[in-house]
A protein has these predicted regions:
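Conserved beta-strand scaffold positions in the cores of enzyme catalytic domains, especially
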Residues: 2, 37-39, 104-106, 213-216
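Flexible, glycine-rich phosphate/dinucleotide-binding loops
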Residues: 12, 46, 113, 171, ...
Length: 216
């Protein structure tokens, strides 16, 4: 199953931290030791999933010490897809960082990589990459950029479920619910940084935009 985490507003809805938490919960909740979840993002950002899951310094981050060398991450997966190589599950997971008893994996990006080249390759091969990862994982979870990237558009199209991280701002909410009807058909909603004193409470959002209570 492919699950995209996304927001229409940059930097306000805690998309990355929400995805990291949900990935961990999905892995811990699984009684099946063979069940695997893999995470990645389609954009470059210093505050990424890797910093949330594997930070060695912050006590506020969920983390686990790991010592893995030699992985090339998402670039290696893109290369395999580009060349038509068929990797085994072992080869896929060798390019990822694993934790939680090898049930949760993260595909990193090269920190010194060119973001424009990465976006071009991800946009071109997005469908094949997702199919590739889904072959060996029960859950593929993507931190999807809110920027107007072609790869973001394609990921949102390919995802089985889109977790929309809402920002409690009336204008931002109105813009989303007026312009993204294609996403709403397969959306589940989170309020990433909930403010109890906001006029746009959970109840108000449910009522105004006619969202089923089980979807927020």
């Amino acid at each position: 199953m492919k699950v995209a985490f996304w927001s229409s507003v940059r930097g306000k809805s805690c998309v990355t931290s929400n995805l990291a938490c949900m990935g961990i919960l999905a892995s811990l909740d699984s009684a099946n030791r063979q069940r695997k979840t893999i995470l990645f993002e389609n954009h470059h950002n210093l505050m990424n999933l890797e910093s949330s899951l594997f930070s060695e310094f912050s006590k506020d981050q969920v983390r686990e010490e790991c010592q893995y060398e030699g992985y090339r991450g998402m670039e290696e997966v893109l290369y395999a897809v580009e060349k038509g190589h068929i990797y085994s599950s072992r080869e896929i997971f060798q390019n990822a960082r694993g934790c939680l008893g090898e049930k949760l994996f993260y595909l990193p990006q090269k920190r010194e990589g060119n973001p424009d080249i990465f976006e071009y390759r991800m946009s071109r091969d997005c469908q094949a990459v997702l199919q590739y990862l889904e072959r060996y994982n029960d859950l593929v979870m993507i931190d999807t950029s809110c920027s107007f990237l072609n790869s973001s558009r394609r990921i949102l199209e390919e995802a089985d479920l889109v977790v929309v991280n809402l920002f409690q701002n009336e204008a931002a909410l109105s813009h989303f619910f007026s312009n993204y009807s294609n996403i709403r058909k397969k959306a589940f909603y989170l309020i990433g940084n909930y403010e109890g004193d906001s006029c746009m409470t959970r109840g108000e959002i449910l009522k105004r935009y006619r969202i089923p209570g089980s979807h927020l």
